Curated annotation (Swiss-Prot):
Modified residues (N6-acetyllysine): 93
Protein name per Swiss-Prot or TrEMBL: Acid stress chaperone HdeB
Compartments where found: Periplasm
Lineage per the UniProt record: Bacteria, Pseudomonadati, Pseudomonadota, Gammaproteobacteria, Enterobacterales
Keyword annotations: Acetylation, Chaperone, Periplasm, Signal
HAMAP family associated with the record: HdeB
Additional observations: In vitro, HdeA is more efficient than HdeB at pH 2 and HdeB is more efficient than HdeA at pH 3. In vivo, both are required for optimal protection against acid stress at either pH 3 or pH 2.
Any one biological process term the GO annotation gives: cellular stress response to acidic pH
Amino acid sequence: MNISSLRKAFIFMGAVAALSLVNAQSALAANESAKDMTCQEFIDLNPKAMTPVAWWMLHEETVYKGGDTVTLNETDLTQIPKVIEYCKKNPQKNLYTFKNQASNDLPN
């Protein structure tokens, strides 16, 4: 094996190792959920990502009395602005504190 081939092999192995580290980091980030997100992290999101995150948070494990459901459009128009306003006023709180507060305000 000459030096040129050895150099190419080291470069290839370095690239594979770097990609493996990036993928491992992405997998760790994917395991975190909105349950761990603070309001400040929510506000710092790209505005296009706020609606799906808030919608998922509001509807995760939500059971309505009588099996009632709410469409995405109705939720976006009524709850998403309230989540954003709440988080701007309470950046240090966990995002799920809004859901807990909202469930206490709504009749079951």
